[in-house]
Amino acid sequence: ETVDTARELFTDKGCRVTFVTSLLTPDVPEDTVETLAITKDDAWVVRTPLVERKPTPNGQGDTFSSVALGTYLKTKSAKDALEAAVNTLYGLVSHMDSGALDLPLIDEQRQILSPEHPFEAVRC
């Protein structure tokens, strides 16, 4: 249902790739979160453990968007873009100090270049 709605709202109107982040639905276990990449012809999902931070870290959307866009422009693959963005963000968030407000972009830049958690996208 989420895939069909996103495809109708965005992809059918000219967007080549639409990402849906922080997807929590009744069929997703409580301790996990899903992220989708949707194109005209395909849809991919990555499921990761849920890492909750209070307050929500600054820069997550910017980081996800920049990694996803950069990877997509380089590879033309929605699957690759999804995996790179999710793996980078998961690595950064999971290495945050308790109570920190900002992503550790400098201290954990290795998570951008070579994320240590290689979650794989599966077709949905």
Which ranges hold each PLM region?
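Charged C-terminal helix
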Residues: 79-124
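Short pre-catalytic strand/loop immediately N-terminal to key active-site residues, enriched for Gly-Thr
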Residues: 44-58
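Short, basic, helix/turn surface patches
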Residues: 4, 48-50, 108
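Alpha-helical scaffold segments in soluble metabolic enzymes
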Residues: 5-9, 67, 71, 80, ...
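Domain-wide signal for the mature, well-folded portions of proteins, strongly enriched
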Residues: 1, 44-45, 75, 96
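Glycine-centered flexibility sites
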Residues: 14, 22-23, 59-61, 75, ...
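Conserved phosphate/ATP/ADP-binding segment of small-molecule kinases
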Residues: 1-43, 53
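Short, small-residue alpha-helix embedded
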Residues: 54-78, 82
